[in-house]
Amino acid sequence: MIRKMSKNVVVIGTQWGDEGKGKIVDWLAESVQGVVRFQGGHNAGHTLWINGKKTILRLIPSGIMHDGVTCFIGNGVVLSPEALLREIEELEAAGLDVRSRLQVSEICTLILPYHVAVDKAREARKGEGKIGTTGRGIGPAYEDKVARRALRVQDLFNPALFDEKLAEVLDYHNFVLTQYLGAEPVSANEVRDQAMALAPALAPMVRDVSSNLFALQQEGKNLLFEGAQGALLDVDHGTYPFVTSSNCVAGAASAGAGVGPQALQYVLGITKAYTTRVGSGPFPTELVDEIGARLATIGKEFGSVTGRPRRCGWLDGAALKRSVRLNGISGLCITKLDVLDGLETIQLGVGYRVNGEFRDVLPYGAHAVAQAQAVLEELPGWTESTVGITEYSKLPVNARRYLERVAEVCGVPIDLVSTGPDRNKTIVLRHPFKG
């Protein structure tokens, strides 16, 4: 039973990822004692700007930038030991204390070289039909987890068990690689040697994360649960099959960190003022004209990990409504509002025409979404700059009207507005921890 009152917040992307979660988690980390990653892998990067300096985090929670905040990688994350240790070294080179403040769940599924080999070979074989994976082994690792053949972090410290499980799983993957995908097999000895070489560096950080999070709650400590990607990429609720391999809705925080659902009191939905998507998949409000190119250029829309250009379009309020319902969102944070500065008019997606009928929420499945024609509502733009504004009343009138219409369409209030990449360029209408 929890002895003291703590407040725990889940931060979720409401679109197809790249909404600006990293900056907001970094800003909110000032109010917490722990930050938790609960799903995904090193396929998605969070970009932070601290005093004008760019930092990209792929696995380690954004709270690592704050002294006194403990960071946790929960069991729902698929973990590449090599990628994690490389990221730690990069942060240490920048002067950050990482290892004493990072805990890794002992039951995280491992990403190993054969997962990467399978991922890349599959995409190469699909050609034009590819989904757009980052090729980092995320999907194949989750497949092993669900098929109950995965190696986990705790197996690194039991070499005999590691060898036994590796032989079984590699027999399967090498058959797929050679007989179906036409690729080269992966050497068991090379996988084992690499894993065993990395294990000692990982060992001091391996913990029972679920129990430690429970202990922090008993002490009344505030926790922040940091989602990766976005709700429309969720393996169940996204535009399937053009999705990621994990559940990235707010409910996944409970299972992916090992905490009870009653521990999650507030869900903050991060929403870009327009919409972007990386890779393949339907995108009803996509702009393939000069306005789309303008959004991409001004918004610097390139993936932080892959460098891939992002497709851009108007904010899809009906897709946002789906995310609001899926996640039980308490309030929204609108990011990159300044990218819309200078547009004479702005369009907002309020629904779709599907087979001649109006629908006010995103349909399920890629085929249905591809058939949906966006219904757009035109709003007046603004000429004034919104960059760096920290008071809502000082926003241009039409910018405020745009935000109010977004809130009306999706049915939840806007609690935060980001007006620039630095953490202090934020308008606070209701603080998730203090409001």
Swiss-Prot record:
It comes from the Bacteria. InterPro entries: Adenylosuccin_syn_GTP-bd, Adenylosuccin_syn_Lys_AS, Adenylosuccinate_synth_dom1, Adenylosuccinate_synth_dom2, Adenylosuccinate_synth_dom3, Adenylosuccinate_synthetase, P-loop_NTPase. Substrate binds at residues 304-310. Pathway: Purine metabolism; AMP biosynthesis via de novo pathway; AMP from IMP: step 1/2. NCBIfam families: PRK01117.1, purA. Belongs to the adenylosuccinate synthetase family. This is Adenylosuccinate synthetase. It comes from Bordetella pertussis (strain Tohama I / ATCC BAA-589 / NCTC 13251).
